[in-house]
Amino acid sequence: MKDLSDTLFAEYLEGYKNLIAKVARIYCQDPEERRDLIQDIIVQLWKSFQNYDSTYAISTWTYRIALNVSISFLRKATTRKNTRDVYHQQVEWLHFQDTVIDENLEQLYQFIDLLKPIDKAIIILYLEGCSNKEIAEVMGMSVTNVSTKKQRIVEELKSYFKI
C-alpha cells in the first residue's frame, strides 16, 4: 500500500512541479532559499496527500498548500536577509546565467516581488487564468474581496509599466 501511495504522489508531483516552482519563484528570489522553499512545499504536500479532499480540484488544493507554505516561509524571513539584499543577489546571479531570460517576464517578476504576500498569491492565480471564484476558494476570501484586490493590483501593474 505504501508503494502505491509513493507512486501516486510521485506522479502527482511530476504533474504539478511547474506550479510549485512558479509559486516558489514569486515568493523567493534567492536560488538557495527557493530550493528550501520548494522542499518545504513538497514536504507539506506529502504530509497532506493522504487527506486530500476530492471536493476541491487538485490544482486548487496544490495552490492553497504552496501559497500557505510560501507565506509562512516569508514570515520567518526576519532571520534571513532583507528583500532588497536578496533581490540584488538575484540580479547578480542572473548575469552569470547561460540562458537569456525574457526581459518582460523578468520585469513582471520584479513588479510581483514588490507586492504583499497575499497580493502575490492573487496575481499568480490570476495570471494562471483562475476565475475570481477559484481565487477566492484558494485564498479563503470572498469573491468581492478578490475582485477588488485584483483590480487594484492590475491598476498598480499598469502604473508600474506606464500603460
Regions found by a protein language model. Give the residues of each.
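A short pre-motif secondary-structure segment
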Residues: 122-123
